[in-house]
Structures are given as structure tokens and as C-alpha cells.
Amino acid sequence: MLDIKFIRENPELVKENIRKKFKEHKLPLVDEVIELDAKKREVNTRANELRATRNKISKEIGALMAQGKREEAEEKKQLVSRQAEELAELERLEAELAAALNERMMKIPNIIDPSVPIGKSDEDNVEVQVYGETKVADFEIPYHTDIMAKFNGIDKAAAGKVAGEGFYYLMGDIARLHSAVLSYARDFMIDKGFTYCIPPFMIRSNVVTGVMSFEEMDAMMYKIEGEDLYLIGTSEHSMIGKFIDTFTNESELPLTLTSYSPCFRKEKGAHGIEERGIYRIHQFEKQEMIVICKPEESMEWFNKMWSYSVELFRSLDIPVRTLECCSGDLADLKVKSYDVEAWSPKQGKFFEVCSCSNLGDAQARRLGIRIKGADGSKYLAHTLNNTVVAP
């Protein structure tokens, strides 16, 4: 979410950014925002004038009453009453305009970093780095689910009866291995100086709309029926939400946290739930990292967080490559993003295991995450997130 002043003063820059993301259908939003903002400010000015006049007349009424001029006082009371009706209508209109303005502003993409490659889809993402030797075996490699089944470590059939497709039971040594990978990732991040946290696994709607776009929300989130609660799709959601409406002293920054949680995703719009594998599923567990920092430090932290992902997989001797997401593949709130992919010997290709993202001040603006400077200044923080591991 961009600053309204920025949109007002740079409409063509905002439109050009939308074009770079190949989302021309969002271009009308810019003019609509500017028009609604002008109307809202006009209404606000008139409302403030009425409030000032009302306060002035109220003082005059008191003076007239003290002088015994009741008839003149009564006339002014009637004027105040009429102004009160007009003010109530203006306040209603202002709230209506504010809601319409906010709805449109939430749909305008964040300004991407100048270094982001221009492209329409993930097919245009750019390779940044490759680590390790990718080998294609000269023998038939079994599916990972077949290996798990050999050790009696997975039961998809029972899970299908209990919850449907996209779920599974992990058991025995496979379940222990799953937990061990998460524990290894947790300790890896703690050694990097991150504070370990287990967050709430449900969040309110204002946090959901604070951390993601409407498109992402519709494609990912499960809503709890009858409650203003959603199951988290990643612990980033509740971890960033932890700092809603807060001020953090500059001296306390950066805030570096690593969190564990189960994650719940509809996977709406994905290429289906895999028949043989357990890659795109509705429930999984993940270790996450988030950073809240000063704006001038966010790109430095972006590179650090990405390097931690690569280092973790290198420590496990797993070949990985990094792709920079092009403009059209970036979610609306993101300024810059890298996907880290691991090599699958069975499939003979890389697949995504981490997504490192810098969101600038977009989430901070929506959620009111602010920094208090040593000189008393107050400004928005930058937020970043990255997957550690999701076994």
C-alpha cells in the first residue's frame, strides 16, 4: 500500500509501475484514488469549517445567555442545530469516501525495486546463482512417497478418508525425520541470532489484509466459519501481525525472529494437488524467518536472509539454485523477491523450497508498524520474510 501523498504527486510513476507488472486492468485505480482523495479532502475541509463555526457560535450563545438575550441565543441555537445536521452528513460522506479510497489503494501494487527484471510470469524469472552438482541417476529413482511407504512412514489413504485430498499422516521414523529437519532449521536460525517464536495459528481479518493482497487472500486463506479468524498460510502472517500499531525505538532494531507453525493453504489456482507426491498440499509445517528494520537497511537484510537459505541447503549437501522473480511474478506488496529451488533427482528439475521477499513499508503502512528515531522522528519500518525450511 502506497502513501496517498506519493500517489497524488507521482501518478504517472505509479501507472508505469503497474505497466511493468503487466496489470493494465489496475491502471484506472490510480485516477480513481486521486479523484476520491480530492473529494475526501474537500469534504474534510468543509467539515472542519463547520466545526470551527459551531465552536465559535457556541461561545456566542453562552455570552448572549449571560446577557439575558435569550431570543438571539435561540436563533443561534437553531443555526447550530442545522449545522449539526450538515456536519453529520459530511462525516457520513467522509467515512464513505475513506472506505472507497482505502479499498482502491489496497489494490495498487507496491513500487518494485529498480533491479527487478521486467517479465510477465515465472517463465521470465532470472537465474542468480547455482550451488552444487545436479546429477541425473542412471537408474530408476523411486518417488519420495514410495520410500516413505517402505518405512511405513506415510498414510495418504487414511488421511483422504479423514480430510480429503492434500493431506497425509506421517508416522514412525519418517515423522521423526520431519521433526528433526525442522529442529535443525530452528537451531540454524537461532545460531544466526534470531529469536525463536511459536505464534498464534489463527489471525483476524485486519491482519490478513495487512500482510497480503486480496488476490493472495482469496487463493490461500481458510476462514473460520462464524468467526473473524483465518488459519495462517505461513507464520509470517501472525509474526508481522505481532507488531501491529507499535512503535519500536531505532536502538532496538533490527527485530529478527524465526518462527515455527503449521500452515494451511487452499492452493486455489495451483496446478492441482500432486497425485504421487506431497508437494502442493493443504497442511504442512514450516520454519520461517522475518526481519523488521530501518528502511535503509532492508536490502542488506534481504541479501543476508537469502544467503541463510542457501547456506542451510549447502549444509545438507542439497544442490540449489536462486531465481529472481520478475516484475510480473511479484506479489503486489513485494519490492523484490528471490525463489530458492532445490534439485529433485527423481523429477530431474529444481522446485521451490524458499521464497525470500522484501516488502518495503507496504505491510508496515497497513498495520501501523512504526519506528521512533533518537531525535523523536517517527516513520514506517520495512518488513522482510523468508522460508527457512518446509519439509
What feature does the model see in each segment?
Residues 1-134, 149, 153:
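N-terminal alpha-helical targeting/anchoring segments
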Residues 27, 130-391:
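TRNA-recognition modules of translation machinery and tRNA-sensing kinases, especially anticodon-binding
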